[in-house]
Amino acid sequence: MRTAQRDAELTARAYGSGLWVHDTLADALTAAARDTPQREVLVDGPMRLDCATLHNRATGLAGAMLTRIPAASVVSFMLPNWHEAAIIYHAATAAGMVVNPILPSLRDHELAFILADADVRMIFVPGDVGGHDYAAMLQRVTAALPHPPVVVVVRGKPLTGQLAFDSLPTQPASAPALDPDAVRMILYTSGTTGRPKGVLHSHNSIHALIRQIGRHWLIDPGSAFLVPSPIAHIGGSIYAFECPVLLGTTAVLMDRWDSDGAVALLTAEHCTHMTGATPFLQAILAAAQRANTRLPDLRVFICGGASVSPQLIRTAADYFERAVITRVYGSTEVPVTTIGAPDDRDRAADTDGRPGIADVTIVDGEIRARGPQMLLGYLHPEDDTDAFDADGYFRTGDLGHWVDGHYLVVTGRAKDIVIRNGENISPKEVEDVLLGHPDIGEIAIVGVPDPRTGERACAVIVTDRPPGPDVGDLRDFLQATGVAKFKWPEQVVVWDALPKNDAGKVLKHRIRARLVDADE
């Protein structure tokens, strides 16, 4: 792993502004446990953790980690939004490990790649959730690895060679000195190459992000975040694990999305903040109307991660009269690139907001960004070559323009990514798997607008075995090959040929336009 490689001027500015500091998240948790030991940081159903309990359990688990794997190893967790994930996250940080959250919706195919690519040394998984046996999946996947990780099962029964979370010793050990500029988190993001890429963040890149949202989103000590978004995303992890320690908030976790349950939790726990992609806001608005509540405690709803309708923002802002409802834009690489428009109701609805600490520019229509919250780079340095321009700006692959010179509007993507319910799906990854189907000669997967999910994945197929496979056939094939369910196409059409240019490149923009026209 590496430390942050930044332009000297940018580094000096980040430290000078206080966005980068010489302390770490582990230092902050130690201070919180000392100064406010009984302050509640996490709510997970009936389980409530205060600062002292979180610190004690995290440092105890850190000791258990250090007795089994070396410092600076990669520690993964593949858990629902459970409080145990917070303990693991802070334990890995205190032990000087690199934490790697993994989506529980991934299956053998994706998991095997991540474990090998990041050389994961320890992984925490649930037993059985939603009818899926994670312990058995880990046994299958790790059997093929040359250096299998230690597998720890949370809320379930471990299989042979695996450990039970509750049986791990909790004796604190001497933790190594921590470098705030060193890598401490790897998050995998879908790439246009079809191969997921590991995004590297440091203590300080995340610290800068947290300080930014603390300044702009009406967050005070005692604010409470409802966290239904997956904690394996950078958004879910910062609101569940970072803000409670660094900003004095409380995280209220939801391990399974239910809009009526979310409204009940927002009310019972007096939640002041929530973030989520478009479907979350749509569902919360409908559920609140059914319950005849305007959620008087809600102060801020941050909406991003997928295409957002201006009318939805306006309707929600009218209904939740006390709340700021605003669009934002960001990525795993440069999280919270814009902070929304919390002080301008119109711009909050019809733009994606103004930049906060990020320096944003548009070159030939493409949005580029750099700043103290930017990734250190990708796990494999060769992936950095095309990701950054000569001035150190991250090439987002998204298209946009400015309104009034200050507010960004994202108009589309140059990158070939489908965003469904806020989840990035790499079409090429799924296409490569489906080309193994005997009835598929050619395939192109594109995202088409969907009022419920933002986008849906549509597979356009050329076959020499008419009528060709249907949606059910593709889903059966993808399930058998271990591809996560959220990546499965929801629509299949069969064409005689795919549109291509003279070089033979498939013209996905034409495919998308034809499908959209057919929907109208």
Walk through the language-model features, giving the residues of each:
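Conserved ATP/PPi-binding loop(s) of AMP-dependent carboxylate-activating enzymes
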Residues: R354-I357, D364-D391, I425
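AMP-binding/adenylate-forming catalytic core of the ANL superfamily
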Residues: G63, L106-F113, I123-V125, M274, ...
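Conserved AMP-binding/adenylation subdomain of ANL enzymes
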Residues: H207-A224, A232-H273, A287
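Conserved AMP-binding A3 loop
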Residues: D50-A52, R184-A208
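Conserved pre-ATP/AMP-binding loop-to-beta segment of ANL
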Residues: H22-D23, P37-Q38, T170-Y188, R195, ...
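Gly/Ser/Thr-rich phosphate-binding loop
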Residues: A268-T275, L285-R347
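Conserved AMP-binding/adenylate-forming core of the ANL superfamily
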Residues: L19-H22, A26, T30, Q38-R68, ...
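ANL superfamily adenylate-forming
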Residues: D7-A8, V129-P180
